[in-house]
Structures are given as C-alpha cells and as structure tokens.
A protein has these predicted regions:
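Non-catalytic structural scaffold of enzyme domains
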Residues: 1-240
Length: 240
C-alpha cells in the first residue's frame, strides 16, 4: 500500500498552509534530520466551492471533491484527507469514489475526545457544520458524544468571523474575545471541552484562550496523516 498522503486543500488555503506545516513538522520530529512528508496536494478554488455551499448544491461540491480525490489517487496517494471540516458533509460520497482510505476528520477528533474522557464538547465551526447534523450525528453514533452548539446569535458571529476574517488571513483581538464569550456561555451550559471544528479557527483560538480543553481539528487531522504515512494508524478505524 502506498503511504503517500493526499490532501484536498484550498478551503481555505490559510488552513491548508497549517496542514502542510503541521505534517512536515511532525515528520521531522519523528524521523529527524532533513526528513519531510511524502505528500500530494490538490488545491481547489475556494470561491467556487463557497458558491456551491451558498446555493445548497452539495451534490456538485461532492462531485468536485471526488474528482480531486481520484486525481490524487491516480498520482499515487495512499490516503485522502479533505482539509476542511465543513466539506466532510460530502465525505462519505467522496470515500465511496476512491479505492484508498479517506481519513475522516470527525473520527480523528472523536477518538481524541473519548481518550480524554470528554462527554459534552462544544462544536465551534461554520454555520453549515453547526446547524446541519452530520458532524454531531457521527460523534454520537461512533463515540457516544453529545456535542453542543452555540445559540443562533453566537453561531452567526462564529460563522461570520470565519469567512469574513480568518479565511482571508485576518486575526482580530475583538474576534478572539467574541469567541471566548461563546466558549464561556457553553461552559455554563455544561460543555466540558471545545472542538475547533473549522480548520481556520486554530488561527484565532488557542488553549490559553479557554478554561476548557481545546481540541484543534486541524492539528489532529494532520497528526493522523503522519500516523498513516509511518504505518501506525489503524486505517479501518478512520476510513469512511
């Protein structure tokens, strides 16, 4: 089996850059010297994907990502990562279109939450991820977790900061404080951890900003990619 990592990125490229850095830093830490990751990146046009999201054309978005995944497999990728939480709404369809494992970001996050004894994490993400049930349903079905989401006003703030600022590389202290308010409100409702369930949120929020344990989906997904590449990942546990 090929151990080349295949990344579908560009959604946004700000977080794809984090994936690339995290994966290569982990490889260098584990192997030492000048070691770097053997990977392939297919970066899509995020503007086109966002237009499909807004139009509710998830079928066309799935087709676009399936085509990207197939191209990576033809180029030699032994696994596929969709480098965005929101587009895991179509992950099962993409997984069915390829003969190699798709490392599902929700499974990677769920495994770490369970290992840490978390039961009621707060999910911070785009409005699509927070309001549609694919993410929370998978956490519940596979890991017995009951994820909370913010109230409607807070969901709007979280979503707008992602698209208007973080996806454009803009990090504001006022937005950090707004996210902290959302986290504190969720803690008062019984949340026992925070999922950074959009790959850009880690640009803004860190463990030092929260009294609750923070689980950064980007870093966890990147680690799973390296685990796959060095043979330590149980592929069946994360394949869709």
């Amino acid at each position: 089996m090929s151990r080349i990592i295949g990344l579908i990125g560009g959604m946004s490229w700000e977080s794809t850059a984090t994936y690339y850095r995290e994966i290569n830093e982990l490889v260098r830490t584990r192997r030492g010297g000048l070691a770097s990751a053997d990977l392939l990146l297919r970066s899509v046009d995020f503007e086109a994907i966002v237009a499909l999201q807004k139009a509710g054309r998830w079928d066309l978005a799935e087709a676009a990502l399936a085509e990207a995944a197939s191209g990576l497999v033809r180029a030699g990728a032994g696994c596929i990562l969709i480098c965005t939480n929101t587009m895991h709404l179509v992950a099962d369809g993409v997984a069915r279109s390829i003969p190699v494992p798709l490392i599902h970001i929700v499974d990677v996050v769920g495994q770490d939450l369970v290992a840490a004894g978390i039961r009621r994490p707060l999910l911070l993400a785009t409005r699509y991820t927070m309001e549609q049930t694919f993410y929370r349903d998978r956490l519940r079905a596979r890991f017995g977790l009951e994820a909370l989401v913010p109230d409607a006003d807070d969901r709007g703030s979280v979503h707008d900061i992602i698209f208007d600022e973080l996806c454009c590389g803009v990090v504001k202290e006022t937005s950090r404080r707004r996210y902290v308010e959302v986290i504190e409100a969720a803690a008062a409702r019984g949340a026992d951890a925070v999922i950074l369930g959009c790959t850009e949120i880690g640009l803004l929020i860190h463990q030092t900003d929260s009294n609750l344990p923070v689980f950064d989906s980007t870093k966890l997904h990147a680690r799973a990619a390296v685990d796959f590449s060095d043979g330590s990942l149980q592929v069946d546990a994360v394949a869709a």
